[in-house]
Amino acid sequence: MQQKTVTVQIRFKTEADGGRAMAASLCSGTYRPHFRVSGGEYLGFVLCNGPADAVAPGASACADAVLIYEPDVVYSALTRGVELNVLEGRQVVGTGKVLA
């Protein structure tokens, strides 16, 4: 069974604004932060199919978010147009929007 995905646009905060210190790879399937919509539950996923080069703090990019815990986790909040926070632990490292 193939896992479901949503396409997201992510903008990382700069380190000075409380974001990451290093660039994140959105293409290799190794970056696994959480999404949170409007203060809701943390939603786990893995990012892939993003740009070949890692995305630097302060930059933005599109990638596919693989809903790795479905069906055990409900991802229904991730609908087209919804805005979200990108978290590493409790730290909000970026913002995003579901595109498809």
What annotation goes with each model-predicted range?
Residues M1-A100:
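C-terminal effector/interaction modules appended to NTPase cores
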